[in-house]
Swiss-Prot record:
Gene3D superfamilies: Glutamine synthetase, N-terminal domain, Glutamine synthetase/guanido kinase, catalytic domain. It comes from Clostridium saccharobutylicum. Glutamine synthetase (GS) is an unusual multitasking protein that functions as an enzyme, a transcription coregulator, and a chaperone in ammonium assimilation and in the regulation of genes involved in nitrogen metabolism. It catalyzes the ATP-dependent biosynthesis of glutamine from glutamate and ammonia. Feedback-inhibited GlnA also interacts with and regulates the activity of the transcriptional regulator TnrA. During nitrogen limitation, TnrA is in its DNA-binding active state and turns on the transcription of genes required for nitrogen assimilation. Keywords: ATP-binding, Cytoplasm, Ligase, Magnesium, Metal-binding, Nucleotide-binding. Mg(2+) 2 binds at E133, E188, E195. It catalyses: L-glutamate + NH4(+) + ATP = L-glutamine + ADP + phosphate + H(+). The keyword Nucleotide-binding applies. The gene is glnA. This is Glutamine synthetase. InterPro entries: Gln_synt_N, Gln_synt_N_sf, Gln_synth/guanido_kin_cat_dom, Gln_synth_cat_dom, Gln_synth_gly_rich_site, Gln_synth_I, Gln_synth_N_conserv_site. Residues 108-443 form the GS catalytic domain. The record marks R62 as: Important for inhibition by glutamine.
């Protein structure tokens, strides 16, 4: 049941003195976009009459077919708590439509809605709980980000060593005021690294929340004179930032991953879901780990998952099944990072899990040993493959994965692969500091 009507939104804007409304949407590479309107244009926007030029957005459309229409999701209305009390700013998350009234196939939100519809046909809905890590960096005198962390704290440390505590507290308060249910907020393993966990929700709500979360974290950090970065590996030699994704399927109001008679407490559906993820993850890594930099995080030795295996306890495996059982039974995929587009990530992961269910796939045996300590020969003997080593490999695996194409649709798939291939080529042809340090004086 909808929380707000059109009239509710108009009244809330008037009663709260809102003067500006951001109509937000996301491009295929996960960048948040918005069209800002004044309160005078609100009714027009709520009547789905707000147009924008889609040819200016990465991966959307060509200039000759550029007209796009924004349709606000009324229940996403929220007032930004950190903006001025005079002339407040609110936002509405929008779906992108074509002028003929059909959903735009290049809208990441639409991609996830299609995946949800496929799950619904089988009687399932997916709940998701993300764990978003980020760094807080100092800025220079011009306000530009540095890689100087403002503390030397470690996992679960607190003030005075955790100098990000005040910023993290204000982020938490702002998120709660915007309707988030915050479950935990703490310093992470690396210096300057933080994590704020919020309650799980259905896949679409969670993807919306991840985009909102990143906006709030960056905005509040800026007010503290800091820069919040969701770059996966900004500093060599310390842990990078991940976005572990916890997933469960529900059917008829019950967790479909539960079987109390199984030795692990897992149902046949849970094992099939795990098998589908393991089968397809290499072909979807360019989505879950979309940057050149993403693969600097995915190396052994920094708690990041590299090897394709699953376990109930073993954190060196790509997929872990946390200890909670009953309604809390879930599967945790540990490779995604927070630079990814959450709509595309969840669409791909859901379709991969459904692929396992539809085709009755079975996962390999659980791996309980420390995979990082295994030799290459031992991993080979145990049938343990690894994720792509870089974005180039990930893009090539994606080109071979039919399910990734199905999950994203032709439009997003084609533009995404082309964009990531170009990104790798741009990186490949640049001269980097490492080359200068090692070669300039030597040769």
């Amino acid at each position: 049941m909808a929380k707000y009507t059109k009239e509710d939104i108009i009244n809330l804007v008037k009663e709260n003195g809102v003067k500006f409304i951001r109509l937000q949407f996301t491009d295929i590479f996960g960048t948040l976009k918005n069209v800002a309107i004044t309160d005078k244009q609100l009714e027009k926007a709520l009547d789905n009459e707000c147009m924008f030029d889609g040819s200016s957005i990465d991966g959307f459309v060509r200039i000759e077919e550029s007209d796009m229409n924004l349709r606000p999701n009324l229940d996403s209305f929220v007032i930004f708590p950190w903006r001025p009390q005079q002339g407040k700013v609110a936002r509405l998350i929008c779906d992108v439509y074509k002028p003929d009234g059909t959903p735009f196939e290049g809208d990441p939100r639409h991609v996830l809605k299609r995946a949800n519809a496929d799950a619904k046909e089988l009687g399932y809905t997916m709940n998701v709980g993300p764990e978003c890590e980020f760094f807080l960096f100092e800025t220079d005198e011009n306000g530009r980000a540095t890689t100087n962390t403002q503390d030397k704290a470690g996992y679960f440390d607190l003030a005075p060593t955790d100098l990000g505590e005040n910023a993290r507290r204000d982020m938490t308060l702002a998120l709660e005021e915007m309707g988030f249910e915050i479950e935990a907020s703490h310093h992470e393993v690396a210096e300057g690294q933080n994590e704020i966990d919020f309650k799980y929700g259905d896949a679409l709500t969670t993807a919306d929340n991840i985009m909102t979360f990143k906006l709030v974290v960056k905005s509040i950090a800026q007010r503290h004179g800091l820069h919040a970065s969701f770059m996966p590996k900004p500093i060599f030699g310390i842990n990078g930032s991940g976005m572990h994704v916890n997933m469960s399927l529900f059917k008829d109001g019950k967790n479909a991953f539960v079987d109390e008679n199984d030795k692990n407490g897992l149902s046949k559906v849970a094992y099939q879901f795990i098998a589908g993820l393991l089968k397809n993850i290499k072909g979807m890594a360019a989505v879950t780990n979309p940057l050149v930099n993403s693969y600097k995080r995915l190396v052994p030795g920094y708690e990041a998952p590299v090897y394709l295996a699953w376990s109930c306890k073993n954190r060196t495996a790509l997929i872990r099944v946390p200890a909670a059982r009953g309604a809390g039974t879930r599967v945790e995929l540990r490779c995604p990072d927070p630079s990814s587009n959450p709509y595309l990530v969840l669409a791909c992961l859901l379709q991969a899990g459904l692929d396992g269910i539809k085709n009755n796939l079975q996962p390999p045996a659980e791996v309980e040993a420390n995979i990082f300590a295994m030799t290459e020969q031992e991993r080979k003997e145990n049938g343990i493959d690894n994720l792509p080593n870089n974005l180039y490999e990930a893009v090539n695996y994606m080109k071979e994965n039919e399910l990734a194409k199905k999950a994203l649709g032709d439009h997003v798939y084609g533009n995404y692969v082309a964009g990531k291939a170009a990104e790798w080529d741009d990186y490949r042809t640049k001269v980097h500091d490492w080359e200068l340090e090692n070669y300039l004086n030597k040769y």
